[in-house]
Amino acid sequence: MTFRNCVAVDLGASSGRVMLARYERECRSLTLREIHRFNNGLHSQNGYVTWDVDSLESAIRLGLNKVCEEGIRIDSIGIDTWGVDFVLLDQQGQRVGLPVAYRDSRTHGLMALAQKQLGKSDIYQRSGIQFLPFNTLYQLRALTEQQPELIPHIAHALLMPDYFSYRLTGKMNWEYTNATTTQLVNINSDDWDETLLAWSGANKAWFGRPTHPGNVIGHWICPQGNEIPVVAVASHDTASAVIASPLNGSRAAYLSSGTWSLMGFESQTPFTNDTALAANITNEGGAEGRYRVLKNIMGLWLLQRVLQERQINDLPALIAATQALPACRFIINPNDDRFINPDEMCSEIQAVCRETAQPIPESDAELGRCIFDSLALLYADVLHELAQLRGEDFSQLHIVGGGCQNTLLNQLCADACGIRVIAGPVEASTLGNIGIQLMALDELNNVDDFRQVVSTTANLTTFTPNPDSEIAHYVAQIHSTRQTKELCA
């Protein structure tokens, strides 16, 4: 029996994990084992919201060392993280400034300024990327405007996964799927767009040409002295999650559910027409030249903040209490910018309900109900937008990532969207990370080949839409009201 042992480092906004994957060639089976799990989160430092990259690096090394201490031969390592954030280095490879997080307020007003000076349509035609106030394009402009004293010292700008790969190997790389999240990569050339870079104030010399997933960046030398290849996987965690989504046919959509919810479909060509621009659709890079045509949704970040503020430790109990409440009494727009990083999430949610003359969610369960119903309704709206964009309805939705364990939200999503939902795999980003490593090791042919492995080894659960549910009736009522308004217009 031939085995491959691959290690995936998967960093999310709230936690990170080092996972060991064992692939058996003859039976094409893949098993995962968690080696080390650790917390991640936002920190306040010198007036900025930052990441503790030193702590994250220590946790990564601890996890890798644990694998080596077990005497396991590691065939390769891959790292994926969230998008848009970066670390600046000087000529000697030392950090310049702070690793500022995307939830920091330093970019306030800069997205509007870019649209005014460059033109919203021109930016979109160049990048194909949705407008989000924390995109790297605006973060770099904030840096160069607010901290000009740092500029003479900067030699390199590495996105988060590339930074951690650099720390392991001493080699620099700019991986394509994550680079596209910056809104700085030209959608036609797959290279940095000089006009957008110039507006940001960044020097093009800070960046190398983006490389597509699958190349070996360099080698990590383990404590035993072995050189282990570090592979440039699809290093944006959503890109990895989509690779592991067992999409079957052109009518399948995906929803990567975690701190963020990212809903979309795969395409061989980008969508950059006026309809896509109006809907703020993004065309992020994927593996094998595919595009991830999707939309960002604020996701379970709202719930995470409520759990933290209310000191709730028993999530299953909260979900059970939430499920017992009537649906759609408290509805908010989870994508409202006021929810990006408020001082108090509970108070912000209550304020929106108060301002819109709705009942006020007071209890933990009511806040949970508000979040779950609002997310499911937004999922339905976004899925409808995506279907209109491509001119074909979807027949099923694959929910992957940690959020797919929330069976209540899965059923609400199926009911609101009116289509079959398939939940799983949970560790989608980790699996997609492993998939690219196995392709680099010549164990698998391509993404479709890997998805067959996932379909046969992952635990998948199907949720059938219930047209008689409260949320389904609510959606039908909304559609009827919209149609009436359109007829009367």
From Swiss-Prot:
UniProt superkingdom: Bacteria
Molecular function GO terms recorded: ATP binding; glycerol kinase activity; rhamnulokinase activity
Pfam families, sorted: FGGY_C, FGGY_N
Chain sites annotated for binding ATP: A13, S14, S15, G16, R17, T259, Q304, G402
Reactions the enzyme catalyzes: L-rhamnulose + ATP = L-rhamnulose 1-phosphate + ADP + H(+)
Cystine crosslinks: C68-C222, C353-C370, C413-C417
Quaternary structure and partners: Monomer.
Protein name: Rhamnulokinase
Gene: rhaB
